[in-house]
Amino acid sequence: MPVTLSFGNRHNYEINHSRLARLMSPDKEEALYMGVWDRFKDCFRTHKKQEVLEVLYTLIHGCERENQAELNVDITGMEKIHAFTQLKEYANPSQQDRFVMRFDMNQTQVLFEIDGKVIDKCNLHRLLNVSENCIFKVMEEDEEELFLKICIKYGEKISRYPELLEGFANKLKDAVNEDDDVKDEVYKLMRSGEDRKMECVEWNGTLTEEEKNKLRCLQMGSFNITTQFFKIGYWELEGEVLFDMVHPTLSYLLQAYKPSLSSDLIETNTMLFSDVLNKDYDDYQNNKREIDAILRRIYRSHNNTLFISEKSSCRNMLI
């Protein structure tokens, strides 16, 4: 059954599943491909299909930019996620629930479905620019949702501001990480009871060396009050405060993701994921009871927050 789209000055334009799958491709030639018979029929159409598809392609993917090979980046996955989201938005409201983007059972692929049928997919290792031997921790459903929202924002930034891909794409991550919509979503998941624009609270506590060592896994093996709690979420429940660490896959996506294919970067990304982010997460979970007890004392003695500064310096805003 075709999907009905409305875009530009086109209304109720019907497109089948195979064409929607093609339109998700950032490769313009592939996206706009028409067979011999289709091209022949286009000669007799009042409104040329080729022209309509070009308009839709531009709306989805943005203006043409330099070849990805020249920029030495791999952003195909992010572009597909953005394209699928755009196609869903152009679909008539009554048909938008036919579009579903989700993870597979093993959380190694993002699947794009229409009417329950997979029309395309992207590999998570390639999407995050890490090697195939990189191990991902299992995400909960709400973490999956946040992951996809962040990826949609990456795709949006790439489409609107292709200049962010220049210079090894170093500015792309910052553009997403500093986006207000992304910050709001991260806080909604991990610090739902806290106003992210609140004033920080000055450090007024003391910690033993043993306690400091326990907290090192919160900050990649180091300890500094001004940055120690930026990966820790918390929320109140029935008079108790609960803590958790931002999932390592989300931390990587927000803090470290770079699509550049420059020499050794994939290996470096993989080492960061495995040897730092996953390790910190495991260390926290394995010592959660003792660490949470320390965090609870700090939280309660600092006006129920870990947004703590020292000598007016603070980097403890969540991620």
Swiss-Prot record:
Keywords: Host cell membrane, Host membrane, Membrane, Secreted, Virulence. A motif (Required to target late endocytic compartments) lies at residues 37-44. Transmembrane segments: none annotated. This is Secreted effector protein sopD2. The keyword Secreted applies. The lineage of its organism: Bacteria, Pseudomonadati, Pseudomonadota, Gammaproteobacteria, Enterobacterales. The keyword Membrane applies. The N-terminal domain mediates secretion by SPI-2 T3SS and targeting of late endocytic compartments in host cells. Changing residue 37 to P: Localizes throughout the cytosol and not to late endocytic compartments. Induction: Transcription is induced inside host cells and is dependent on the SsrA/SsrB and PhoP/PhoQ two-component systems. Highly expressed in host macrophages and when grown in an acidic environment.
